[in-house]
Amino acid sequence: MKFFAVLALCVVGAIASPLSADEAAIVKSSWDQVKHNEVDILAAVFAAYPDIQAKFPQFAGKDLASIKDTAAFATHATRIVSFFTEVISLSGNQANLSAVYALVSKLGVDHKARGISAAQFGEFRTALVSYLQAHVSWGDNVAAAWNHALDNTYAVALKSLE
């Protein structure tokens, strides 16, 4: 039991300002508008930042147009988007903080092993937000909720890159 109390304190410290229920609802609602556009989301990231595409051995050095409609691309895009869907679905509930922390920490650890830099995490964020702005109902409240969510996510993931 003591372990879980310590873990909970670590999570709260790492995610000092978790999303409110209202912010989580805004993020979930906007994500629901695009979460089935997996291929388009990943293609937008690769188009904006070819250096990210170069980190994927199965896609490195290939023309985006030639890989976008392949099963391998769709499968990988679905993995990425499904990760976000899982984290978003857990957001807004204090009881889920340790689960969110574990998922996002693992994301950072896994990407550190692949040589992904903090700058590339930043590029991914920029491309994702640009995609969201163009494809969902976007206003100041949506921007604020997404920034809060991504700030929390990146604080944990980037700590794992250290």
Curated annotation (Swiss-Prot):
Entry keyword annotation includes Signal: yes
Top-level division of the source organism's lineage: Eukaryota
Gene Ontology CC terms, in alphabetical order: extracellular region; hemoglobin complex
InterPro entries: Erythrocruorin, Globin, Globin-like_sf, Globin/Proto, Mb-like_M
Domain Globin: residue ranges: 18-162
Keywords of this entry: Heme, Iron, Metal-binding, Oxygen transport, Signal, Transport
Signal peptide region: 1-16
Residues bound to heme b: H76, H111
Gene3D superfamilies, A to Z: Globins
GO molecular function list: heme binding; metal ion binding; oxygen binding; oxygen carrier activity
Family designation: Belongs to the globin family.
Subunit: Homodimer.
Extra remark beyond the main annotation: There are at least 12 different components in Midge globin. There are at least nine genes for VIIB variants.
Protein name in UniProt: Globin CTT-VIIB-7
Gene: CTT-7B7
